[in-house]
Amino acid sequence: MSADSADSVPSPRSAFATTLQIVSVVSFTFICYLTIGLPLAVLPGFVHDELGFSAIVAGAAISVQYFATLASRPLAGRCADTLGPKRTVLRGLAACGASGALLLSAFAFARWPAASIVLLVASRLVLGIGESLVGTGAILWGIGRVGTAHNARVISWNGIATYGALAIGAPVGVAISHALIPAVLGMLVIALAALGYYLARLITPVPLVHGERMSYASVLTRVLPHGLGLALGSAGFGSIATFITLYYAARHWPNAALSLTVFGTLFIGARLLFANTIKTHGGFRVAIVSFAFECAGLLMLWLAPVPHVALVGAALTGFGFALIFPALGVEAVALVPPASRGAALSAYSVFLDLSLGITGPLAGYVAGAFGYPQVFLCAAVAAAAGVALSTVLYQRQARLSGSGAAA
């Protein structure tokens, strides 16, 4: 075996050390999304039942966070590129703590509904900004610590931290609000953000990357095809997250929550076991296979005659969706100079925010007009379009590589 080939196969110890370096910074993403997940399932009931507002107002008060995240993506990318990932994460955690203080105030002013809802909306807006800063900063911090060769692993672990925290946070938040009082959630958000801020300060920053910085508009244009692919793939996740329980209820099937569990389990399992395939086979090839699995799973949900088939469909969808973000994300980030990686990552992530924001209302229209199964058929068509788009991008990349080699 040559020295080059020996070096290309990391030892178990070096692989573990790399993973440890990644986890040490994406843990701040976990903390950030815990502050999001803890009050998430409690707030709609608080706004509707305690404050007396309509379900529409309750939904809007929760959803405003996602618009804040979307609007602050350019800010997060610029901060990560110019201030550095560590300072970006610290600012994001500070915003999470501030959102906790505003949330605590909203609970304290529950006797005055108008004041309480204003404080709650302010809390959600600040939390959305914090989510954007921490999510972008943590990924770039991880890449800076382990090198660009491990981009896919960093993005994959960051996603595990994100969905893991949301899965844990929501039920824990409900349990705490029932056992104690909802105001405790505000205190817990402040405490978690403070803990994250303290721990983040202890970790060494990575050097700023100097060099050419592209304008955000130029970066957005460059990653547009990859972002469209991400949006197509996210439609399946959005459809399952929003409508799987209603789909089960319409068919009088039990255990709708189990389908969400298997979706999440296969999602995390795929990221843990197969993230390295992106480095080995390239992002586009992995994306093509991932979209195909997602499409197959969504078609099974559409046609499922019994709950067991729907369960397999949810599992395949989670398995397929798992690697779409990192697979296309690695290719998107590679298109820009190193000094613009933060902008590329934030611009690419915008399409996830947009897709999840648009999928709900569109899928709701489809469900009302044609029935719940057709929601998953439409998502399957989107995944099939993702296969086609990824194939075109892969072929274009191969042509460019071939012409470059010939030159």
From Swiss-Prot:
Subcellular location: Cell inner membrane
Domain of life (superkingdom): Bacteria
PROSITE patterns: MFS
Name of one Pfam family that matches: MFS_1
Cell membrane keyword on record: yes
CC annotations in GO: plasma membrane
Alphabetical keyword list: Cell inner membrane, Cell membrane, Membrane, Transmembrane, Transmembrane helix, Transport
Protein name per UniProt: Uncharacterized MFS-type transporter BURPS1106A_3201
Key word Phosphoprotein present: no
Transmembrane segments: 22-42, 51-71, 101-121, 126-146, 154-174, 179-199, 227-247, 258-278, 286-306, 309-329, 347-367, 369-389
Cross-referenced Gene3D superfamilies: MFS general substrate transporter like domains (1.20.1250.20)
Membrane topology summary: Multi-pass membrane protein
Primary subcellular site in the record, as a coarse category: membrane
Source species of the chain: Burkholderia pseudomallei (strain 1106a)
Annotated family: Belongs to the major facilitator superfamily. YhhS family.
One Gene Ontology MF term: transmembrane transporter activity
Coiled-coil parts of chain: none
